[in-house]
From Swiss-Prot:
A Pfam family: DUF480
Family: Belongs to the UPF0502 family.
Coiled coil: none
InterPro entries: DUF480 (IPR007432), WH-like_DNA-bd_sf (IPR036388), WH_DNA-bd_sf (IPR036390)
The protein's name in its UniProt record: UPF0502 protein VS_II0353
Classification lineage: Bacteria, Pseudomonadati, Pseudomonadota, Gammaproteobacteria, Vibrionales
């Protein structure tokens, strides 16, 4: 299975996995329901505004790669779609409930810390604590058939490192590190500027007080 997904394909697969677990009575999804799921504002990063045409084009591509199937009946007026991405009879990717939850959440929101993943996978799987999330992540990193997740450099000022899925291809670790340094540098520059502004304001107040004192003595 060719598992390199475009951003839209990743969103579609993530939504289908999510809805299979959280709303089984309404799964498989119609094109309208799938588009709504892709564009919803909660538990999505970034928030998208895809048209049904955008989603259908991506779904057709995923059907061609056997990652999605059309489950509508012969006489059905509405097509319904389900994923074949993981945990299927003949599929390459077989996940535990916890692994599936983490992968799903990453497909929907990108890079996240173990703490964020534990909070955001509440409807998909149970984790006793953050350490259990970290343990599952390390299994996905060290997977014998090939890593599905990578640990990113810890951002300055952050307690936890983020993890990113590799289902959309290799991650440029240096780019993430550079972006982190740039963000910290920008923040530091902003703080320095604010400090200088505060110092200037204080000096102006002192000058005004001295002028008033001099004038009172004349």
């Amino acid at each position: 299975m060719n598992t390199v997904l475009s951003p839209i394909e990743a969103r579609i697969i993530g939504c289908l996995i999510e809805k299979e677990v959280t709303t089984p009575d309404h799964y498989p999804l119609t094109l309208n329901s799938l588009t709504t799921a892709c564009n919803q504002k909660s538990n999505r990063e970034p928030v998208l505004s895809l048209s049904e045409s955008d989603v259908l084009d991506a779904v057709d591509g995923l059907i061609g790669r056997r990652m999605v199937s059309d489950e509508s009946s012969f006489n059905s007026r509405v097509n319904k779609y389900q994923h074949r991405f993981c945990n299927t009879e003949f599929g390459d990717l077989q996940f535990t409930e916890q692994e599936r939850a983490i992968i799903c959440c990453m497909l929907l929101r990108g890079a996240q810390t173990p703490g964020e993943l534990r909070t955001r996978t509440g409807r998909l799987a149970n984790f006793s604590d953050v350490k259990e999330v970290e343990s599952i992540l390390e299994k996905l990193v060290a997977r014998e058939a090939g890593a599905l997740v990578v640990k990113l450099p810890r951002e300055a000022g952050k307690r936890e490192s983020r993890y990113q899925h590799l289902l959309s291809g290799e991650v440029d670790i240096e780019a993430f590190a550079t972006a982190s340094v740039s963000a910290v540098s920008s923040s530091a520059s902003s703080e320095k500027f604010e400090e200088l502004e505060s110092e200037v304001a204080s000096l102006r107040e002192e000058v005004a007080e001295l002028k008033a004192l001099v004038e009172s003595l004349l």
